[in-house]
């Protein structure tokens, strides 16, 4: 089957490193991962052949492939990785981004291109994500580690819905920040804010990908 006829989520799982390519093209491989690559490219007027070539090159060369194959890792190892690499990182990222955003809004609020509203949106994401991470760490992940797979089914569905909501919140951030593209004369804080938001989005998308496309399906398929 050609890459064009595969879902974004399937490609993100089968080709480690593909997530980086998808982010470059602003292709949603986590919350919108059920869309075929061909359809997603058409929706955004992207060059499908170019994307397929990059995926082929990545698959063949394994260049930049430092991603572990989580499809066969133990649940405990995967969960510990998610908490250490993503949960803890998000808790560090968001307060700093809020501080930077407040500075930019306070100093440049009179400019037409100032991202007014990004502080409130980041605070919303921080509040909701903090609750989400806590529920995973205190309820869902212990269930999975203890092998209570049937009980984990409903919490997983709730987490997936919250992932969708987080994806929608990210789209609002992109809209407010011109897809995280600072103006040519942006100050250091403005540039640092957008760079930090981009990093946060990269991390969040990969975080959701690991759960939605690998961890959760594995648990739901347990007999």
From Swiss-Prot:
The species this protein was found in: Haemophilus influenzae (strain ATCC 51907 / DSM 11121 / KW20 / Rd)
InterPro entries: Hemerythrin-like, RIC_family
GO biological process: protein repair
Functional note: Di-iron-containing protein involved in the repair of iron-sulfur clusters.
UniProt GO molecular function: iron ion binding; nitrite reductase activity
Entry keyword annotation includes Repeat: no
Protein name: Probable iron-sulfur cluster repair protein HI_1677
Cross-referenced Gene3D superfamilies: nmb1532 protein domain like (1.20.120.520)
Family recorded in the similarity comment: Belongs to the RIC family.
PANTHER family tied to this protein: IRON-SULFUR CLUSTER REPAIR PROTEIN YTFE
Annotated Pfam families: Hemerythrin (PF01814), ScdA_N (PF04405)
Places the protein is found: Cytoplasm
Keyword entries, A-Z: Cytoplasm, Iron, Metal-binding
Gene Ontology CC entries for this record: cytosol
CDD domains recorded: Hr-like
């Amino acid at each position: 089957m050609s890459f064009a006829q595969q879902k974004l989520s399937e490609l993100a799982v089968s080709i480690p490193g593909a997530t980086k390519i998808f982010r470059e093209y602003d292709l949603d491989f986590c919350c919108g991962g059920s869309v075929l690559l061909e359809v997603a490219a058409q929706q955004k007027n992207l060059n499908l052949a170019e994307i397929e070539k990059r995926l082929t090159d990545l698959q063949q060369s394994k260049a930049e492939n430092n991603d572990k194959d989580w499809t066969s890792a133990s649940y405990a190892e995967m969960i510990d990785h998610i908490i250490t690499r993503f949960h803890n990182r998000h808790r560090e990222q968001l307060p700093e981004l809020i501080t930077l955003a407040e500075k930019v809004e306070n100093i440049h609020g009179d400019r037409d291109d100032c991202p007014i509203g990004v502080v409130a949106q980041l605070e919303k994401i921080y509040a909701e994500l903090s609750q989400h991470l806590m529920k995973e760490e205190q309820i869902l992940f212990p269930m999975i580690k203890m092998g209570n797979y049937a009980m984990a089914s409903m919490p997983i569905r709730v987490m997936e819905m919250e992932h969708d909501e987080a994806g929608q919140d990210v789209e609002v951030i992109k809209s407010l920040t011109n897809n995280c593209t600072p103006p040519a004369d942006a100050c250091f804080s403005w540039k640092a804010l957008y760079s930090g938001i981009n990093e946060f989005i990269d991390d969040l998308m990969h975080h959701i990908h690991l759960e939605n496309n690998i961890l959760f399906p594995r648990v739901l398929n347990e007999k």
